[in-house]
Amino acid sequence: MSLKDFIFTSESVGEGHPDKVCDQISDAVLDAYLEQDPKSRVACETLVTTNLVVIAGEITSKGKVDAQEIARNVIRDIGYNDITMGFDADFAVVSAHVHAQSPDISQGVTEGEGLFKEQGAGDQGLMFGFAINETPELMPMPIYYSHELVKHLAGLRHGNKLKFLRPDAKSQVTVEYKDGKPVRIDTVVISTQHSPDVTHKQIEEALIEECIKKVIPANLLNNTKYFINPTGQFIIGGPHGDAGLTGRKIIVDTYGGYGRHGGGAFSGKDPSKVDRSAAYMGRYIAKNVVASGLADKCEVQLAYAIGVAEPVSVHVDTFGTGKISEEELVKRIRANFKLTPRGIIESLKLLEKGRKYRETASYGHFGRKGSTFTWEETDKASALKG
């Protein structure tokens, strides 16, 4: 994305969106296995539709987990606890269908086995990390405020501040840029599921005053257009309105389309899967590059071959904002970051006791605060700067 005048849009979805329900269930199952056995190999997929949950995948672990009960607890926490919504934690049919990880894959990711003795990547693939200095979190502004809106909306619902709110919700933020810098919010879209006993005008007024104006700074709301539940009604929602699947919100999970994506989803995957762990490392690297002042904007690509520990390539793009050459930056990255699967897991403490991947499954994996989000630390900035 070049430095010029443009308008850019990103979206987010709430914790009650069908795809996000699935992501949270998959990550809650992952957490339960890792808590009992840190060496668990987990690839957990979830499907939801009207009062039905199907869990499937490949899991090899010494742990014993009640996936059905975990799913019900997640659904209950989100707020689907009323059968009239068509999806209810206590009445949904929940089935689990899992089997062991293929031994052909296992030998490539288990240290001491396979053609290469070091722990190899769990699959081939390419992963991207991105950072930009237009928000304090070093995230693109459109996705940052999209997340903040649905997060605030969930807080209003759980706090019973707006009694008409129901779990399913989406947001979209359009930002106007001048000379590559954000100057104003052009458009905000919020669609939220609601109870039948509220008017569209009441919803519109409440969301503008209690959500949008509480989240987005007033100086950015300049001639901003608001579209609140623009179909006019959103009573039927959640898995009753649309089927959901794990891994179907990968752009919401990352940079809202502002940075590139390698195509691999995160939720339900243990850290041996570089789809997840290397994307976290990419963000860690890019954020430290920007935090160091070596670039205003940075995108990192890592690529792996299945069963091989070292990445097959490391690529950096600073979009003309770099203070040193990209070739020199790659050298410094290789010198300061461990890029093997084992090195990534150790550096980012991805198997640390008590870690909850479920926390990542709503409101984006990046630009977040808290001990879970170790890839958001900027402790390598000084070393990179040299």
From Swiss-Prot:
Domain of life: Bacteria
Cofactor(s) annotated in UniProt: Mg(2+); K(+)
Binding residues for K(+): E45
Binding-site positions, L-methionine: E58, Q101, D242, K273
EC number: 2.5.1.6
One GO location term (cellular component): cytosol
Residues engaged in binding Mg(2+): D19
Catalyses which reaction(s): L-methionine + ATP + H2O = S-adenosyl-L-methionine + phosphate + diphosphate
EC main group: transferase
Pathway participation: Amino-acid biosynthesis; S-adenosyl-L-methionine biosynthesis; S-adenosyl-L-methionine from L-methionine: step 1/1
Keyword set, alphabetical order: ATP-binding, Cytoplasm, Magnesium, Metal-binding, Nucleotide-binding, One-carbon metabolism, Potassium, Transferase
Keyword ATP-binding: yes
Binding site for ATP: H17, D168, A169, K170, D242, R248, K249, A265, K269
GO biological process, one term: one-carbon metabolic process
GO molecular function: ATP binding; magnesium ion binding; methionine adenosyltransferase activity
Region (Flexible loop): 101-111
Cofactor note: Binds 2 divalent ions per subunit. Binds 1 potassium ion per subunit.
A Pfam family that the UniProt record links to this protein: S-AdoMet_synt_M
Subcellular localization: Cytoplasm
Record's function text: Catalyzes the formation of S-adenosylmethionine (AdoMet) from methionine and ATP. The overall synthetic reaction is composed of two sequential steps, AdoMet formation and the subsequent tripolyphosphate hydrolysis which occurs prior to release of AdoMet from the enzyme.
Assembly with partners or alone: Homotetramer; dimer of dimers.
Family the entry assigns: Belongs to the AdoMet synthase family.
Matches recorded under PANTHER family: S-ADENOSYLMETHIONINE SYNTHETASE (PTHR11964)
Protein's UniProt name: S-adenosylmethionine synthase
Gene field: metK
